[in-house]
Structures are given as C-alpha cells and as structure tokens.
Design a protein with these regions (language model features):
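Sec-dependent N-terminal signal peptides of Gram-negative exported proteins
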Residues: 2-23
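Loop/turn-rich, solvent-exposed surfaces of beta-rich toroidal or solenoidal domains
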Residues: 288, 309-378
C-alpha cells in the first residue's frame, strides 16, 4: 500500500451516530444536512434533508464549481465537512482513495494499494473497477477493495489504520464481481456483506465480532446489495439482502431473526431494500416486486407476503415518499408503486440503462447513466418530468450525491461538483 500526503488542513466534522441516545439533536441535525458520508446519504435512504431544492433544473441553475479527472470507478462520492472522498482503479492494477478540498477540488491526500481484478468475461462490458461506496465515520474512512479487502484509513492523512482481507482470513473464494457491498458503520462496529457472509468488525481494530449468513461466495453467492439498519417489529435490526434471501439480523449478536427467500434470476437481487412501517419492499431482476410484513410476537419473528406485482427492478434502489416507492426498472422506465395496495399507479417512457435516485419533499433527482440529470415530481398520480440537463459526456453509473446546495456527479473518469441554485432568486 502506498500513502501520499499532499497537505494537512481542515478540521473534521464528527458524524453523530444514529443510535446515540445522548447526541445533541441540533448538532446532529446540522451534521446530517452538511454531510453525505456513505451509501445513499446520512441515513442510507436516498433522502436529502438539507436546503430546499430549486423548482427547476436548467443549465442556468447549475454552476460548475470544479471538476477533477480520475481513473474509472463506480463508487459514489462521499462528503464530510470540507472534504470530498472518491475512489478509482488505476492502471488496471491499483485501487486508490482520494481526499479532495470541497471548495476547490484540490487533492489533499491519496492512498493506494494493489488490488484490482477482472470480472467474468460475460460481464466485462460492465467494467472491472472499484464499486463499493466508502463510509466516513469521525476521523476514519472505510473503503472496500474489489478483492474482498476492507481498508480503514485515517481521514486526516490517508494513513492505513487496519486492513481486513476476507479471502485470506476466512479462506473464501474471491467474489466473482468484486466487493460490491458498501460498508455500514454504527456505534462501535462496521458491517459488510463480504467473505461469503455478513460480517461485523470492530471499527477501531478490524477484529471480527461475529459472522453469519454464510454462503458459498464466488460466482453464485457473493452479495450485490448493502445492509441498512431499521426498527422493524419493535426490534432494531440489520436488514440484509443476499443473492437468494432477505434477512433481519441482530446487530449486536449476529442472530438471524428472520429470513425470506426472494425469487430471483441467477441471484440478481441487487438493490438495497426499503423499509415502510413494519414491512420491507424489494424487487428482483427478471422477476417481480414484493412487500413483506415482518411480525414480532412472543419473541418470535414471522414473515408474510402482503402483495407482489410485475415490476422488475434491477440495480437502482428506489426512494420512498409518502407511502409510495419510485423505482427505476430493468426495462429502463420509472414506475410508482402504492405500498398500501401494490398497485403500479404509472410507468414512464424509456430512459438510460440505470438511474440513481435522491428524494426531497415532492421532488426526485435522478442521475441517468447517459450523463443526464433529471428532476422529477414525486406525483403518485402521473409521471412528471419537471426538467433535465446534460451534466456529463461520460457514463454516470456511480450514485449521485447531494450536500447542501451542491450536486456531485461521478462520471466514469471525472468527478464534477455543481452548485444548484434558483436563477430567479439571484440579485
């Protein structure tokens, strides 16, 4: 591993943990607004709780602040305090983490290690570069490398604090498509779907706390999804989607509380599940969408299918707004599903191959894989495209990020940062 420090500057915002009972609610709210520290934002739900968005999206409303060129990556950018973190695969050999100045894009440090790998030939068109979105927690950043390696680096200077090689430690096969899961940090622990299992590590030392949901890994079983934390049936739990099943797991002990097989095509259960009340929504490639109700009675959990419909999700995780999920489908269309009934209230026309989604109020910001940013109305009655603008000449598979009034676009080889304003409000 190589670590190159370019400067030492800035004081880091310490992210309040969602589970803390003593956190200052005012400070915590400010930190939630001012950061995008992990996969799909502060609460891993794809919802932006910061400044209200403008009513339209036009070239005049997006001001390019800076852009930087890198090697290819599918990792979403993460933003904490005055720093931005992004990854790249370099020279088909190294994986690199960059820390950038949020105002200028100037590099502060970079850390690299040998670790790239080739995905199977039939998926080569999808690229063999780093995929997982890092997670920042206080003065540490957790980064997953393709060869089933989890790195813990110091955010100040990129120094490696610990490294966990799941293949070496567990004797499991390499995940055929690389380490895809994005780390989840909560309390004293970091959780990942890696090493042909769900693993809880001590976030300070990298020591294994527990391991569960073991599978065969490799081509057939290595996870594509990322875990979230939710309270379901009165019990706080990890919600974990593997290639074959959906499970609830006790975050402290690793006990599997419940599991539900999710019908799938070749294990293509990819998106991050969505929690609604005591139910869980998921959707599977070339299959269907489901809502499962999780019950908890006399210390026993039960799972019941509430409904299913023919909406076929793929890689895009939906956003939940007012009892409806807005989902981008395998067939490259948007759809809206009423969670109470399972009814698909509308389906749009065609767009790109993939869209990442962020919601706020009655609006959805969607980054189309063709480099087009879309502003949609979260209208359950009809599809409503408010406006759109071209933001990249490259493909944009990495997840969109929004922090304050800034929009972060990670193209295949470029990171762009825009300030999104209302031109009518300018003096």
């Amino acid at each position: 591993m190589f670590c190159r420090i370019l400067s030492h500057c800035a004081t880091f915002l310490v992210i309040a943990r969602m589970a803390s009972a003593v956190a200052d609610p005012v400070v915590q709210a400010q930190e939630l607004r001012d950061s995008w520290p992990q996969w799909r934002g502060p609460q891993r739900d794809g919802i932006h709780r910061g400044k209200s968005w403008p009513e339209s999206l036009t070239p005049d409303s997006l001001n390019l602040l800076w852009q930087v060129t890198f090697g290819p990556s599918y990792s979403g950018p993460v933003i904490v305090g005055d720093r931005v973190f992004t990854t790249e695969t370099k020279d088909k050999k190294y994986e690199v983490v960059h820390a950038l100045d949020r105002k200028t894009g100037q590099e502060i440090w970079q850390t690299s290690w040998e670790g790239s790998m080739n995905v199977p030939f039939f998926a080569a068109a999808n690229g063999s570069w780093i995929r997982s979105t890092p997670a920042v927690d206080g003065d540490r950043i957790y980064v997953a490398g393709m060869r089933d390696v989890l790195m813990c680096l110091r955010t100040e200077d990129g120094k490696q604090l610990w490294r966990f090689d799941f293949v070496k430690e567990f004797g499991t096969p390499l995940p055929a498509f690389g380490f895809v899961c994005s780390p989840l940090v909560d309390g004293d622990y970091v959780y990942v779907q890696a090493g042909a299992s769900l693993v809880c590590l001590n976030k300070m030392t990298g020591a294994v706390v527990w391991r569960t949901l073991k599978d065969n890994g490799g081509m057939e079983d290595s996870a594509f999804s990322s875990p979230i934390l939710a309270t379901i049936g009165g019990k706080r739990q990890l919600l974990v989607q593997g290639r074959q099943k959906l499970s609830g797991v006790d975050p402290m002990t690793g006990e599997v509380l419940w599991s539900q097989f999710v019908p799938n095509y070749r294990g293509m259960n990819i998106l991050t599940p969505v929690v609604w009340n005591d139910s869980v929504f998921t959707s599977s490639y070339q299959n269907k969408s489901w809502l499962y109700r999780i019950s908890h009675d006399n210390q026993q959990f039960g799972v019941a299918e509430v409904w299913r419909n023919n909406a076929q999700g793929y890689m895009s995780t939906p956003v939940l707004i007012d009892d409806h999920v807005y989902l981008f489908l395998q067939n490259q269309r948007f759809t809206c599903i009423d969670l109470k009934t399972g009814e698909r209230t509308w389906t749009s026309g065609n767009f790109g191959k993939y869209c990442s989604l962020i919601g706020q109020g009655d609006k959805i910001l969607a980054l189309d894989q063709r480099g087009i940013l879309l502003l949609l109305r979260a209208n359950p009655k009809q599809f409503e495209l408010i406006s759109s603008v071209k933001v990249s000449d490259e493909e944009t598979w990495a997840h969109l990020a929004v922090c304050d009034d800034e929009v972060y676009i990670r193209g295949l080889n470029t990171l762009k940062v825009f300030r999104w304003t209302d031109p009518k409000a300018q003096p």
